């Protein structure tokens, strides 16, 4: 989950959106 979140952060940079995606 953490690695997914970090990867999403690099793509979008929006934490709450990353949480929904993951």
Curated annotation (Swiss-Prot):
Compartment list: Secreted
Assigned GO CC terms: extracellular region
Post-translational modification: Contains 2 disulfide bonds.
Chief location: secreted
Tissue expression notes: Expressed by the venom gland.
Protein's name in the database: 2.39 kDa venom peptide
Function: Not lethal to mice by intraperitoneal or intracerebroventricular injections in doses up to 100 micrograms.
Alphabetically ordered keywords of this record: Disulfide bond, Secreted
Natural source organism: Heterometrus spinifer (Asia giant forest scorpion)
Highest taxon of source: Eukaryota
């Amino acid at each position: 989950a953490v690695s997914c979140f970090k990867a999403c952060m690099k793509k979008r940079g929006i934490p709450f959106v990353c949480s929904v995606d993951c």
